[in-house]
Amino acid sequence: MQAGILIIGSIFWDQNEIRSAWRQSRLRMADAIDVAVPIRYGRAAISRANTYTMVFSTKAPLGTAKVVPCQAEIKSFDDLLIEAKALWLSESMKTESDSISAHWGCTELKVKDASNTLAAQWAQYTADYRADYALDHADDEAPALDASGLLQMPWPSKTNGEALTEVDLLLCIANRPTLRHGDYVGPDDIALAWLKNSSYDDYFYKNRENGIKTFQDDEILGAFWAAQPGGCGGPMF
């Protein structure tokens, strides 16, 4: 089976040595595919001075993410676990770890064929990490994942409307969102966080530069321009 990594943020473009090595050794970056998935800026990341990073949100309109095929074929659950652990190392920027989750986020699986036995094996493996997989979500939306770490969204389509047939299963990182009164903050608050900490606005601009976009982007840009001409240092896309 062909696995792919569904990427909604900086592990696609970050030049950190660990992430660069992961992309080079495990992914076919030249074959990256634009796909439509419901994403938004929704996690206030402590590592980025509480500016916002990307999360899955089932009530969000579709944005653009990336699916990148893995180099290695998946022939067994052990093969899948190797890819999941490599993905988690890249996300957490660690050189050694046997984990695929933490309190702030977790590795998710989506299989195209519902009868695929890998999903059941995945659920059994993640049983010891249920607290990590109990991610918050807005009061008025269904969760993006279940307690066993299976992504609870339809199999994505390409942004051009074509079916995604190049991969049979997807691995991705789902981060715990930061909610306020049971909901996500709006684009003005998201922009304000970057305006206060402009050294971290590269996350937004580099996402856009690399084709990772959300339904909120135009409003976030509008808030940048309204607050100070030229935005907060990044290029205008």
Task: Please give the residue ranges for each predicted region.
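Glycine-aromatic micro-motifs
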Residues: M1-F237
